[in-house]
């Protein structure tokens, strides 16, 4: 029976420690909510400047890619609309020819 009580105390002790650790980690995280990925930049120094330069380079590259994609999209739209204009002009000519043929038959 003494062994069982000792085992129970040990088991509860381990879980008690685990519970306290979990609570401790949880409170640490909630206290540091305002700190985030930008903490290196906020610290300043060489690492902060490097991080800022890398972020700016990344966003400039993203902007270039977006502008290139937008330009390509607009160029494709222009080509599509030109083809549509040509198709409609051919259809107009075809209808004019039909009208001409109908007038000729009268």
UniProtKB/Swiss-Prot annotation:
Exhibits variability in chain length, mitochondria have distinct pools of protein cleaved after the 24th, 25th, and 26th amino acid. Residues 63-106 form a coiled coil. One of its GO terms (cellular component) is cytoplasm. It is found in: Mitochondrion. One of its GO terms (molecular function) is mitochondrial proton-transporting ATP synthase complex binding. Residues 26-52 are annotated as: N-terminal inhibitory region. It comes from the Eukaryota. Keywords: Coiled coil, Mitochondrion, Phosphoprotein, Transit peptide. Endogenous F(1)F(o)-ATPase inhibitor limiting ATP depletion when the mitochondrial membrane potential falls below a threshold and the F(1)F(o)-ATP synthase starts hydrolyzing ATP to pump protons out of the mitochondrial matrix. Required to avoid the consumption of cellular ATP when the F(1)F(o)-ATP synthase enzyme acts as an ATP hydrolase. Indirectly acts as a regulator of heme synthesis in erythroid tissues: regulates heme synthesis by modulating the mitochondrial pH and redox potential, allowing FECH to efficiently catalyze the incorporation of iron into protoporphyrin IX to produce heme. Belongs to the ATPase inhibitor family. This is ATPase inhibitor, mitochondrial. It comes from Homo sapiens.
């Amino acid at each position: 029976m003494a062994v069982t009580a000792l085992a129970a105390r040990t088991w509860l002790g381990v879980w008690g420690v685990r519970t306290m650790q979990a609570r401790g980690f949880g409170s640490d995280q909630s206290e540091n909510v305002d700190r985030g990925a930008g903490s290196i930049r906020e610290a300043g120094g060489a690492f902060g400047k490097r991080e800022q330069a890398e972020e700016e380079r990344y966003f400039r590259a993203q902007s270039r890619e977006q502008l290139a994609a937008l330009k390509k999209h607009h160029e494709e739209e222009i080509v599509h609309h030109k083809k549509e204009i040509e198709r409609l002009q051919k259809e107009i000519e075809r209808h004019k020819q039909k009208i001409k043929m109908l007038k000729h038959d009268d």
